[in-house]
Amino acid sequence: MMKKILNIRLSYLYPTLFVLFFLALTRFTPTKLTAGQLALYSVNTFLFGFYFSPLLSAQKGRVDELIKTVRKETMILLDILTQSHLLKAEDRHQLKIRLRTYMESIIDKPDVKADNVYYDELLHFTKQEKYKDNSVMNVIYERVAKTQENRDTIQNVSLNRVYSHEWLVTLVLFGITLYFVMQTDYGSVIFFRALLAVLCTGLSLMIIILAKYATLTHKQAKRMWTPLKQLRTDHFEDITADEIKDMRAYVAKQRD
């Protein structure tokens, strides 16, 4: 349920939440806040902003780092493809099958790991005895070896999520802030009720945006794999699904 909600675009959530809060405010009975309640509201608001901002900044930075690393991985693979034009046609095709199979093992996968069996197969293929004196294949081997660092970065950064206790503190502070906002005495002026609805909607969207970044469902995060997908589309049209299937079976057999 939550996953479906997080996949809804923010442009759709905003008007929906605004209407819900506007209707909710019509049923709330505003109260005059005492000096003590106002002090509590002020302290809570400060704590919410103080605690929330670093979390959002860290998760946005996490997504930016993932995008940067995937682009770096794409450039390495593109360099390998460029170098492969100097190989014999059959050797190049076999290399591309292994590259495509490797790419399929990481694209859109939430559990990318530094240890990758298709990466191992690429290393083994490029380091065969028959390529010992092949300078082009030696360069490709070095490029392939560099991808391990990228996968390690993706794995480590992906694990840097918002922990449960951080969510608990954030949601408690958010709930208190939202409650005080909805208790504000706006009188009978509809305009101020609309302003409060906008404020409540904004607060809620901030939490949703944090959740989207944390779960990598934000629009920015969804574009993370675009460079690799584009590379796959532009340079691997000659690799068939059967060839990828056979390569997976071959690698699985080698592991047994």
Give the predicted meaning of each segment.
Residues I67, K72, L78-L159:
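Structured inter-helical modules in multipass membrane proteins
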Residues F52, H85-L86, D238-E243:
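Short extracytoplasmic
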Residues M103-V112, I244-D256:
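Charged, low-complexity cytosol-facing tails and large interhelical loops of integral membrane proteins
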Residues M2-T31, L159-Q254:
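Alpha-helical transmembrane anchor segments
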Residues P54, I80-H85, L205-A214:
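Juxtamembrane membrane-interface segments at transmembrane alpha-helix termini
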Residues L33-L47:
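Loop-to-helix transition at the N-terminal end of transmembrane alpha-helices
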Residues L47-V70:
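Transmembrane signal-anchor/signal-peptide helices with a preference for the extracytoplasmic
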